[in-house]
Amino acid sequence: MKIINLTKGTTVYTSNVYLVTGTWNAIKDQNTLIDVGRDPTVFDKINNASTGVGKHKVDQVIITHNHYDHASLLPRIREAYQPKVFASSQYLKNVDTVVRDGDLLRVGDETAEIIHTPGHSSDSICIYCRESCTLFSGDTPLVIRSDDGTYESDFVRALENICKKDVSVIYPGHGDPLHHNCKELLQTSLRNVQSAMQKHA
């Protein structure tokens, strides 16, 4: 799997936009955009990316949640590349398939699991790629350093589910990827959330 952050270094307020392709650009690999953001320079970067001879530049789009900084360019992306569009929100226009917790998709050359993570928004999802132990987290709060917050039980269950995965790298909706001690970070966050739940019980 190859991952390119198409909005790295941008001056536009936008989410990260990840172009995920297969390592060898095989025909069966699914060239995938995770979020589309709102920076129009992504079009040139997509067009210049190595996505495989005779293949679509973008086979599919997965939207992590329906906020403008993550989904604004979706109509233009759809017009330019005619991808299939997956999202958890049934209210987002231009969606082909509404995904549910536990659904499996092919992303690049890997199998990816959809994890529903309500909290930041009711339609938030993470995307977990099993073979490379990679988690695309959108805006799901995964770095929780204290037990001062309040959390919905559905989010706690989602975080417990994520903590059961073998996660070695996290690609967030904003900022740089996390490559070190991801499992320990997630376990610490879960302990803080569980402590917060007990405090507010």
What feature does the model see in each segment?
Residues M1-D29:
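Short, compositionally biased "basic patch" segments
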Residues T14, K93-V99, R145-G149:
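Short, charged, surface-exposed secondary-structure boundary motifs
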Residues Q30-N31, G37-G108:
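Active-site HxH/HxHxD metal-binding segment of metal-dependent hydrolases
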Residues G22-N25, S89, C129:
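Short acidic, glycine-rich loop/turn motifs
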Residues K2-L6, L19-V20, G102-C129:
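Core dinuclear metal-dependent hydrolase active-site scaffold
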Residues I4, I62, F86, T97-V99, ...:
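Hydrophobic/aromatic beta-strand patches that form the interior of the parallel beta-sheet core
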Residues K28-L33, R38-P40, T111-H116, S122-H200:
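Metallo-beta-lactamase
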